[in-house]
Amino acid sequence: MERRKATVHVGNLAPSVTESLLYNAFIPFGEIISVALHRKEKAVDRSYAFVEFDEPEDAKEAMENMNYSILCDRCIRVSPANFALSAEETAVPDIAMLHPESADFQTFKSTSTPTS
């Protein structure tokens, strides 16, 4: 099982939210592997968390049921977690993107004219 498919991002968290509170809020949807709460020191309104489930289906159910729900007087956002891709998963860039001066680019213009 891929970790990324079983992990949700929880955003717009209130400053009073704890990992324990998140665990208890999300445990009805399935076995939780981990809860990681992240706080920005200078911006408490930017707190977010990652909740990793054992099964991707549980993460999907949590997103469907918890997105836009109220937690500690805040409307939270629950979405799939977006992790940085590993080197093996990253596509090899086109040489033209790395060295545009060496590529033979063509500019395409629309040849259609407005109809009346």
UniProtKB/Swiss-Prot annotation:
GO terms for molecular function: RNA binding. Residues 6-83 form the RRM domain. It is found in: Cytoplasm; Nucleus. It comes from the Eukaryota. PROSITE patterns: RRM. Transmembrane segments: none annotated. GO terms for biological process: mRNA cis splicing, via spliceosome. Keywords: Cytoplasm, Nucleus, RNA-binding. GO terms for cellular component: cytosol; nucleus. Pfam families: RRM_1. CDD domains: RRM_PPIE. SMART domains: RRM. This is Uncharacterized RNA-binding protein C428.12c.
